[in-house]
Amino acid sequence: MELLDSPAPLRPLHDNPRLPKADGAQKRLSVERIYQKKTQLEHILLRPDTYIGSVETVTQQMWVFDEDVGLNCRDVTFVPGLYKIFDEILVNAADNKQRDKSMSCIKVTIDPENNTISVWNNGKGIPVVEHKVEKVYVPALIFGQLLTSSNYDDDEKKVTGGRNGYGAKLCNIFSTKFTVETACREYKKLFKQTWTDNMGKAGEMTLKHFDGEDYTCVTFQPDLSKFKMTILDKDIVALMSRRAYDIAGSTKDVKVFLNGKRLPVKGFRSYVDLYLKDKVDETGNALKVIHEEVNSRWEVCLTLSEKGFQQVSFVNSIATTKGGRHVDYVADQIVTKLIDVVKKKNKNGVGVKPFQVKNHMWIFVNSLIENPTFDSQTKENMTLQAKSFGSTCKLSEKFIKGAVGCGIVESILNWVKFKAQTQLNKKCSAVKHTKIKGVPKLDDANDAGSKNSIDCTLILTEGDSAKTLAVSGLGVVGRDKYGVFPLRGKMLNVREASHKQIMENAEINNIIKIVGLQYKKNYEDRESLKSLRYGKIMIMTDQDQDGSHIKGLLINFIHHNWPSLLRHNFLEEFITPIIKVSKNKEEIPFYSIPEFEEWKSSTQNYNSWKIKYYKGLGTSTSKEAKEYFADMARHRIGFKYSGPEDDAAITLAFSKKKVEERKEWLTNFMEDRRQRNVHGLPEDYLYGKDTNYLTYNDFINKELVLFSNSDNERSIPSLVDGLKPGQRKVLFTCFKRNDKREVKGAQLAGSVAEMSSYHHGEASLMMTIINLAQNFVGSNNLNLLQPIGQFGTRLHGGKDSASPRYIFTMLSPLARLLFPPVDDNVLRFLYDDNQRVEPEWYMPIIPMVLINGAEGIGTGWSCKIPNFDIRETVNNIRCLLDGKEPLPMLPSYKNFKGTIDELGPNQYVISGEVSILDSTTIEITELPVRTWTQTYKEQVLEPMLNGTEKTPPLITDYKEYHTDTTVKFVVKMSEEKLAEAEAVGLHKVFKLQTNLTCNSMVLFDHVGFLKKYESPQDILKEFFELRLRYYGLRKEWLIGMLGAESAKLNNQARFILEKIDGKIVIENKPKKELIQVLIQRGYESDPVKAWKELQNKEEEEGDESGEESAAATGPDFNYLLNMPLWYLTKEKKDELCKQRDNKDKELEDLKHKSPSDLWKEDLAAFVEELDAVEAKQMQDEMAGITGKPLKVKGGKQGGKQKVTKAQLAEVMPSPHGIRVVPRVTAEMKAEAEKRIKKKIKSEKNESDEKQEGNSSGDKEPSSLKQRLAQKRKAEQGTKRQTTLPFKPIKKMKRNPWSDSESDSESDDFEVPSKRERVVRQAAAKIKPMVNSDSDADLTSSDEDSEYQENSEGNTDSDTTSKKKPPKAKAVPKEKKGKAPKEKPLPDAVPVRVQNVAAESASQDPAAPPVSVPRAQAVPKKPAAAKKGSTAKDNQPSIMDILTKKKAAPKAPRRAQREESPPSEATAAVAKKPGPPRGRKATKRLTSSSDSDSDFGSRPSKSVAAKKSKRDDDDSYSIDLTADSPAAAAPRTRPGRLKKPVQYLESSDEDDMF
């Protein structure tokens, strides 16, 4: 019983019939049913979807081939499993092409009536031979037994479609009858066998002898019942037919027959055409196909898709209908290139992402891939990673160019516009609301959005303060019809703004919301205007140029989006007075400066009126606001549309495409203004008393043009002094303050704003001050202010400067030598708010625009000028003074140790320094100019160390040894990588070369006209002509002033002598009688005072009351009668007579000097001080390193010095490094030529060309070792060469320049010595300055006559001097006599000439000398070599260079030192007594400046005294003995040395306005 009860699964059922069915028995049976084992054949039939896909019918869109239509995409109902088994047989046939290239034909026959399909192919058949292991013939094995294949060897790289060993067997299994016939010539047998019943029964195999061509034919009858079908319907036949076409297109050189007809497909390209017939793009043109057969394994076609991303692709003849990684691999390459093009063309539109670009592509890919993998047996999606493809598909430039032009880009751009419009429309409300929320600071009109909204006006104000003014005025006109909204600063230029900017711009969105505007709505009639919340916009801005710009931007905003609104006079402006004059209770407002000037010239006693300037709307009071709104007719000016010329004017002002037209517009304006000045005509102005409306054309051409011009004036410097207005204001203030002590940057900024009437933010002013004082490499070559504190370094390009609250500055000792105080008297000073401010331009003794360079972007023009060497420039001026042509100049940056080579006209390549230490280490010791250390580290070395997604790591490590002034990276890399990098060019690989293009040398000339210069020589020549003329004016002024002082001393001496002799008795006599006596005896009224009054009559008339003026015109003998009694003593009498004689002699000496002599004296004094300053800088830099050991408690000096030497070695270049010479190749020069041509074409761009990326290196095959050997030979061979080399070989000093001063001073000035071009003669430059009708000329001609009159002692000519005030008066009273002794001058000039000659004779690049000493050329040459050797000669060791630096220059420097003390003495602070003082006495113009109260002061009076005298701006006495006060100050503060600084990089503050 136990046995009967126990579960016995093997017991027959009839053996225990009486056994009751219990729950346990049910469970037993379910276990058997649940857990079953099937054979593989059963499994395939039971679960077909695992192997062949679904056996249920599906309906989806597919490409099919219909007899009547051809290839088309339509909804198809088919069974994927049936489609797949057919496809397996077809792909097997195509695979045979990869095994046998001679295969040429495939025949596909589909017989729906008989439910029979056959695929026949020629080419090598299946081996008809018995398999020795399986003991069965191979065809029977691979077609009739599962898990058999020839594709299982993954070590064998195959490009066939078969992969898993299922394909043909699956077709056999799902067929009622499956026949294989194959003929094998090799085995001379024909094999044939048939399987039936889903491969359940194998028929008898037949073998026959065969001697023909190989072939294989598979014929099968699908088991339609397994697919729930009864016949092969139209859809499945159409799908199979398309696969036949696929094979014809994807298999090369194979004819495909379908049902006996050959398919008309001759390759992949013609196959693609089947898809595109009758397809057109958006414009109705046939789609353009770009085709490329990349290599034997890849063929790609591309065209435009109008319904998302489409792809037709094949992997080894398999149709990958879902794509895969092979499609992504190709598509991503195309997308990357297209997206760059789209971004360029769509800078301002909606951001475009890669998938959005892809959505416009239709791509066709035919590929052969080794051992491909798929995500399923259905093989619709290829999953193999690209790195395993076994081949690459790099699309050519030609293909990419075609892709850009085939319509895809245009389609994307159209889509972008559509999307942008859609997004913008979401910002607008289509319904008019009476109340709106979420707009802060809006004071809405009560009727806005109501039925009366068309009568409402929205007042847009410039800032909150202006809103307050408008709200005050609303008290008069009421709030029902007027709303107010303040704008924050300037509006966006929507014409050129990006879509993102417009979408995110709160100002624009708020205005649209407040007014109720809708994008793309056409406001053609009055009805459409009623849909708006406001019927008008009134613009209320300051009456300055920035206010005009805001008005223009608002007009542009409306015109760009809703041009029809302008025709409805939708816009108005509210004007307020710029100036009000009042007298008693009468008040006159003026709405423009020219109108005020007209009134002034026509009103005799205008001085008696109170004049008030209104700088902005904030100046007006609430009471005045109410007055403005009460007289709405006068203050409300409507904009009136006058026709197409208005549209053209607005577009001209704001469109990016109108750059050239804008240049012409501004040029015409400048010329018109100049002509008006020349002819004394008033400026044109808009707002007269009767002005009620304004056309847009008038607004643009008469008001907005003033802003555009002022934008240029603020952004582009003057040729004369190289300064922008903000910088000039800083300099003016520093000259006027004449600080003896350093001053905080923030305090100086406040002082500038006060003294020079600066109207912009002080933050930008502080940046200007910082920029003027910076002296790191790549900034200024000559900083006009001293950087006392952290003003920025080359580590961050100056961005690491400390807050202006913490840093100090003061004038550089060189500033007043560059801008001599005596020249201030002949400059034309400007007036702002009736306050005398800075001059139109200063007049330096050298062109500062070349020394410190310039950079700025204005309206229509941009400016970019590199820095040039100070001494080269000085020598060129001396050449011009001697009647010679200036030598060509290369850009030069102070303390830059790299090289600058010329590639073409105004095209240069700047190279850093790199040397090789050993086979795995290089050392970078200089970066290209304006490549900042930190930026280089982050953007170049870090990616090289860590690698990026696209590039593997190149270096293994780097170490940093920089200081704030030097660069040193020691970089480690593998030997192989270093060899590769060296072959390409280390400068190229490590991005140590940048291009400098100077095709935008645009400057304001001396008459305020923008002019483009072709070369630095052109700038130099124009400056030279003007400066020489101003030396003539200076001489005339000095002759007049000295004549007056001489007359005064003569009168004083005669008066004393006559008093002593008793000829004049003054005791106990009335003053009137004394004056009468003096007049009778021929004494003049105070000559100095009279001369000054003559010079300043116009200014005095403006500043003083009528009564004071009258008093000043009477005779003044106080200069005689106020002399102290002790002047009657013998000593004082003799001293006075001596002063008189000295003054006469000084005057005579001056008369004998030519303007050229005066200039040469100034240059000599400047160069002497420059030497002293640079020597001091060098000394400070070396302090603590090579100089005195630092004091440490308990430390020994010796030990300390060792430490400092170690420190020095650490930051200095390694002595063992082999310098790598920068390559300047023909390829780089060709690139430069291309850039020039491109520049000519693209001159329409507003912004100037920026420094371009790294240049490519040459393709020299030689290794470093070979190249160095060749280089050494070449250098030795060319050492004496006297002809100009044609290929830049290495780093050297400036070529024609052998400057004595630079020698003594050091390695700072390294300039490539070889010039590849012959001296360029500047095309005869226009010299408008000589006979120009500018204001300056008119002024100077007046001065000439005046000087002559004064020199003769005439004092009656006050009335003739109307035009003199601005120029005649000098801020400082004392003229700085800076002429050095006669001795140094001859020294300097001839030696320079000799040096130029000497060096031009040996202009060979290999010549070591950097420059030639002032005294003896021969001994100095070796010293100079210190620099050159590093750069050029046989790669000497750094140690040699260092010893040369230390030893060789020492002696010459000492010799120089003996001459230089006088220059130090001239620095007014007289800290060092002794020898320096001797120099002072020999200054060229010695005279003590006499004032009314101190006529007997001695010539030798201390500098401090003289300086204090200059502090008084109204004191006009001139002490020609005194050294420049500015020069003096530095002597007290010797610590700060100047380095090249330029305000270019961070651009002057003016650019920020």
Curated annotation (Swiss-Prot):
It is found in: Cytoplasm; Nucleus, Nucleoplasm; Nucleus; Nucleus, Nucleolus. Gene3D superfamilies: 3.30.1360.40, 3.30.1490.30, 3.30.230.10, 3.40.50.670, Histidine kinase-like ATPase, C-terminal domain, Topoisomerase II, domain 5, Topoisomerase, domain 3. Residues 1413-1432, 1517-1532 have a biased composition (Low complexity). One of its GO terms (biological process) is apoptotic chromosome condensation. GO terms for cellular component: chromosome; condensed chromosome; cytoplasm; DNA topoisomerase type II (double strand cut, ATP-hydrolyzing) complex; heterochromatin; nucleolus; nucleoplasm; nucleus. Residues 716-1163 form the Topo IIA-type catalytic domain. The keyword Nucleotide-binding applies. Keywords: ATP-binding, Biological rhythms, Cytoplasm, DNA-binding, Isomerase, Magnesium, Metal-binding, Nucleotide-binding, Nucleus, Topoisomerase. The record marks K490, N493, R662, K663, K724, Y758, S764, W932 as: Interaction with DNA. Mg(2+) 2 binds at D542, D544. Residues 12-25, 1242-1262, 1371-1385 have a biased composition (Basic and acidic residues). The record marks I857 as: Important for DNA bending. PANTHER family: DNA TOPOISOMERASE 2-ALPHA (PTHR10169:SF61), DNA TOPOISOMERASE/GYRASE (PTHR10169). This is DNA topoisomerase 2-alpha. It comes from Gallus gallus (Chicken).
